[in-house]
Amino acid sequence: HKLGGDAIPADLAASFWTGLRDQGDEFFIGAERAVAGGARLWRLSVPSTTPELKLHGEQLIEWGGAQRWVVTPLEPRALREAAAAVGGHATLFRALDKSGGVFAPLSAPLAAIHRRLKASFDPHGVFNPGRLYPDL
C-alpha cells in the first residue's frame, strides 16, 4: 500500500500552504464541524517513515509523514497507544471534552519533576491550574 499525493500547481501552492498553516483548509474546517459534534482533533508526532496508521476517522499527513492530524471519536487511550506503538506521541488539539487530558499521562518520575517545577515557578498555583495535566 502506498501513500498517495498530487503535485500542486504553482498558482495554487501559496493558498494551499497558507490554508494548512492557518488551519483554514477543508480538512480543518471539517474537523471543526466534527469537534462540534463530539469528535476530537488529535496531533500525532511520529517518525516520518511510519506507515499509515489504522485509525478510525479522517487523517491529514504533513511534515514528510512526521505530523499526522486525526479527527476521530476514538477514546484518548486508542490514539496515545497507536502513537506510542510507533515511537511517537499524541496531543489532544481540539475537543469539547478534554477530561481525558491533553497530553499523555506522565510516568511517576516525570510527574514528580513537573510538580516540583510548577511549585518552584508557580508557588501559589495561579498559572493555568490543570491546563496541561489535570493534577498540576
Model-predicted segments: where are they?
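Glycine-rich, acidic/polar active-site loops that bind/position phosphate-bearing ligands
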Residues: 1
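Conserved glycine-rich FAD pyrophosphate-binding loop
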Residues: 5-136
